[in-house]
Amino acid sequence: MRVEGKPYTTIWTGEDGASIKIIDQTRLPHRFEIIAISDVEAAARAIAEMWVRGAPLIGVTAAYGLALAMRADPSDANLERASAHLKATRPTAVNLQWAVDRVRRLIESAPPPQRFAAAFAEAGVIARDDIALCEAIGMHGLSLIKTIAAGKPPGAPVNVLTHCNAGWLATVDWGTATAPVYKAHDAGLAVHVYVDETRPRNQGAALTAFELGQHGVPHTVIVDNAGGHLMQHGGIDMVIVGTDRTTASGDVCNKIGTYLKALAARDNNIPFYVAAPSPSIDFSIADGVREVPIEIRSEAEVTHISGLSADGEITRVRLTPEGSRALNPAFDVTPARLVTGLITERGVIKANASALAAAFRERVAG
């Protein structure tokens, strides 16, 4: 996608062909800064401190991180150590585990001197595959938007509600939940996005609004608790969110607050779709509420907030009284019964075990 008219992906190979570069997303939307990553510690820090975030992107970053670990020390011991270190950075998103395991399986039987080149190349394949998956999700989601548009007055926009950032900044390109929106906008369809601010890190207000604006997509930022009100008054035509982990039964783990949006959508008969690339589907578990590990992040993300001051500096301030505790679960689980459909790279499917198994037979067999 584009920033100030220049094409970017969220992660790319450095000029030396043996490092990577990323966009520091903690600085957006007020600063656009690029960081070079040349070792596994930097890759792990980028994931843990959310310089990169979004399930698909942290998976790609972790794959490159494992490759960089092999450049420094291609031993079996370091392969084990680096794999565990990267997996521990963000426990909820299944893409990270999937990508690390994929690279590890490829290289563990290779002679140590060949491991870096093989791992780095495989990370590149994962990155390119992610772009293709997201674009396919965009095309399948476009059909849903077209159907809704056909039932509205000519020229009236399809109003889409989204939560957090499941855009191109959360993937390598296109995004998951935003890919259908970009495809619709590029096809000339009138589309408008209501962007949940998404406390506590405000990734909707900071990131989704930024990328939609860069692409020229009409959008409006709303506070997290406004979505239900808009649904009650006919302001929302459909909801599209992303997923950090979807279970074999169709339960969806996504950014905290997603479950409440699904409940409101069900109460108002509004379709609730989840953009779910197959690497985000975890066929090893079925009960999302009981089995998905939920990351608990720092209290400081709730008690403090960053923004742009009047003098143009990014400033951090306290919101809560000194001494007040905060609880900060990063994700929640939306039961499959509340999901209208999963928009995958293989089409829109029902959120249930049989539909998922039929669509991804090779994953179930494996």
Swiss-Prot record:
The gene is mtnA. The keyword Metal-binding does not apply. It is an enzyme of class 5 (isomerase). GO terms for molecular function: S-methyl-5-thioribose-1-phosphate isomerase activity. Gene3D superfamilies: translation initiation factor eif-2b, domain 1, Translation initiation factor eif-2b, domain 2. Catalyzes the interconversion of methylthioribose-1-phosphate (MTR-1-P) into methylthioribulose-1-phosphate (MTRu-1-P). Substrate binds at R53, G54, A55, R90, Q203, N254, K255. The record marks C164 as: Transition state stabilizer. NCBIfam families: eIF-2B_rel, PRK05720.1, salvage_mtnA. GO terms for biological process: L-methionine salvage from methylthioadenosine. PANTHER family: METHYLTHIORIBOSE-1-PHOSPHATE ISOMERASE. Keywords: Amino-acid biosynthesis, Isomerase, Methionine biosynthesis. This is Methylthioribose-1-phosphate isomerase. Its EC number is 5.3.1.23. InterPro entries: IF-2B-related, IF-M1Pi, IF_2B-like_C, Initiation_fac_2B_a/b/d, M1Pi_N, NagB/RpiA_transferase-like. It comes from the Bacteria. Pathway: Amino-acid biosynthesis; L-methionine biosynthesis via salvage pathway; L-methionine from S-methyl-5-thio-alpha-D-ribose 1-phosphate: step 1/6. It holds the Pfam family IF-2B. It comes from Methylocella silvestris (strain DSM 15510 / CIP 108128 / LMG 27833 / NCIMB 13906 / BL2). Belongs to the eIF-2B alpha/beta/delta subunits family. MtnA subfamily. It catalyses: 5-(methylsulfanyl)-alpha-D-ribose 1-phosphate = 5-(methylsulfanyl)-D-ribulose 1-phosphate. The active site is at D244 (proton donor).
